[in-house]
Amino acid sequence: MVRNSRLDICSIVNAKSGICDQDCKFCAQSSLYNTGVKRYPLLDEESILEKAKEAEKMGAVRFGIVTSGKRPTRDELLKIASIIEFLKVTTSLRICASLGTLEKDELSYLKDHGLDRYHHNLETSPGFFQNICTTHTFYDRVKTVENAKSIGLEVCSGGIFGVGESFEDRLELARILKDLEVDSVPINFLIPIKGTPFENFPELDVVERIKTIAAFRIVLGENVTIKIAAGREKLGDFQALAFFAGANGMIVGGYLTVKGRSYDDDRKLVEGLKELMGW
């Protein structure tokens, strides 16, 4: 449990869906797998604003623009920068982006247009990474995190668990994230998606999920936000335990291709947590 903390709530928009040539084996958006996911190009600013306003109503303080693919085109980057600028004057949200591998000048350009935080998961340990993706490397991801940190952006970077990794892989990832001095760590648990190579993977049980959250809190210390994200719904009635184990943030409103909990369910959870935890 993290004392004297604040519940960090964020929401995301799937701003560009599918059309990805990478082979991340857990992901519905890879064009290499037949998952039936919707495919569409970058949304316009009004569509993204609509999602941002929904996030505000749900109590989110951060809003992330997420696009599929290894990296955006130059035209997409320019449009996203304009959208970020638009959101900064039309909402009270802090704006995050998850656009894949970017260079320092590209990240600086987004920061100049109002970007507060960059999200780029490392996913798992360097030794296990090739088991979940072969079209880019673990160190490609590390470089992007380092690029974002070096130009003064906040960084959100975490992993996905239940993909066949060992507990030591999880601990190694936590130690690397600590060394990188990231600001926020999302904890995602595999949701097996039909059509992906991991569609038949067994899901982690509640105890294993709680142990993972607790281990990350022990390694990361108290100054880093730990957010429960994809798969948190599978904790069911034990979801509050995640916060006693060390989480102090969560994603609301659903994920990229998977629905999350209902607004009413999350509202009740947040109200209860604030009372229990003193947030």
Swiss-Prot record:
Signal peptide: none annotated. GO terms for biological process: biotin biosynthetic process. CDD domains: Radical_SAM. It comes from the Bacteria. Belongs to the radical SAM superfamily. Biotin synthase family. HAMAP family: BioB. The keyword Thylakoid does not apply. Its EC number is 2.8.1.6. PROSITE patterns: RADICAL_SAM (PS51918). Pfam families: BATS (PF06968), Radical_SAM (PF04055). It catalyses: (4R,5S)-dethiobiotin + (sulfur carrier)-SH + 2 reduced [2Fe-2S]-[ferredoxin] + 2 S-adenosyl-L-methionine = (sulfur carrier)-H + biotin + 2 5'-deoxyadenosine + 2 L-methionine + 2 oxidized [2Fe-2S]-[ferredoxin]. [4Fe-4S] cluster binds at residues 20, 24, 27. Residues 2-232 form the Radical SAM core domain. Catalyzes the conversion of dethiobiotin (DTB) to biotin by the insertion of a sulfur atom into dethiobiotin via a radical-based mechanism. This is Biotin synthase. Binds 1 [4Fe-4S] cluster. The cluster is coordinated with 3 cysteines and an exchangeable S-adenosyl-L-methionine. Binds 1 [2Fe-2S] cluster. The cluster is coordinated with 3 cysteines and 1 arginine. PANTHER family: BIOTIN SYNTHASE, BIOTIN SYNTHASE, MITOCHONDRIAL. SUPFAM superfamilies: Radical SAM enzymes. Keywords: 2Fe-2S, 4Fe-4S, Biotin biosynthesis, Iron, Iron-sulfur, Metal-binding, S-adenosyl-L-methionine, Transferase. Gene3D superfamilies: Aldolase class I. Homodimer. The gene is bioB. Pathway: Cofactor biosynthesis; biotin biosynthesis; biotin from 7,8-diaminononanoate: step 2/2. Its cofactor is [4Fe-4S] cluster; [2Fe-2S] cluster.
